From Swiss-Prot:
Entry's family note: Belongs to the shikimate kinase family.
Superkingdom, taxonomy of origin: Bacteria
Designated name of the protein: Shikimate kinase
InterPro entries according to UniProt: P-loop_NTPase, Shikimate/glucono_kinase, Shikimate_kinase/TSH1, Shikimate_kinase_CS
Cofactor info, note text: Binds 1 Mg(2+) ion per subunit.
Residues annotated to bind substrate: 37, 61, 83, 146
Underlying gene: aroK
Organism: Blochmanniella floridana
EC number, as in UniProt: 2.7.1.71
Length: 185
């Protein structure tokens, strides 16, 4: 059971496992799970790719900022954020000040494997890739831009590369106990 900090926010690049790990972590801690991308889809009634196409990245990021503001005010949650949510200084501020931020870190090689066939990610659409030689180049640019922002607000960093989901969740639980964020069982 969490003590003072009953809010856990997962950040990191696409393909790091935020949604999958977040669901299991929430279940283990008996907390409610939210995914900011799914919440945007619920609010708009369309998928995030459509929002990206119609409103552009700026419109999408504005929606994302509002959703993160709302969700970070909830109690007893695990929140999986979109990979680009940290681009907004307002969203970063909400995440950093309102809960415990866990940076799920992964390599570009793992991102390539995990996102290869994913059609739901707006940044992986061919129109975005138009300016890049390949997906690796895009992911490298995103990493250069975003990794320092993930590191800036994270309380805990966990690599998801060589571990199963269960193993990563267990690792997070150990770190939460070590940091005094949850009672020892």
């Amino acid at each position: 059971m969490l003590t003072d900090n009953r809010k856990i926010f997962l950040i990191g690049p696409m393909g790091a496992g935020k949604s999958t790990i977040g669901r299991q972590l929430a279940q283990r801690l008996n907390l409610e799970f939210f995914d900011s991308d799914r919440e945007i889809e619920t609010c708009t009634g369309v998928n995030i790719s459509w929002v990206f196409d119609v409103e552009g990245e700026v419109g999408f990021r504005n929606r994302e900022e509002k959703i993160i503001d709302e969700l970070t005010q909830k109690k007893s949650i695990v929140l999986a954020t979109g990979g680009g949510s940290i681009k907004s200084h307002i969203a970063r501020d909400h995440l950093a000040k309102r809960g415990l931020v866990i940076y799920l870190k992964t390599t570009i090689d793992k991102q390539l494997v995990r996102t290869k066939r994913d059609k739901r990610r707006p940044l992986l659409k061919s129109s975005t890739l138009f300016n890049y030689q390949n997906l690796r180049e895009l992911l490298e640019d995103l990493a250069k831009e975003r990794n320092p922002l993930y590191e800036e607000i994270s309380d805990i960093t966990v690599s998801t590369d060589e571990y199963s989901v269960k193993c990563v969740v267990n690792k997070i639980l150990v770190l939460l106990k070590k940091n005094g964020a949850i009672y020892k069982d």
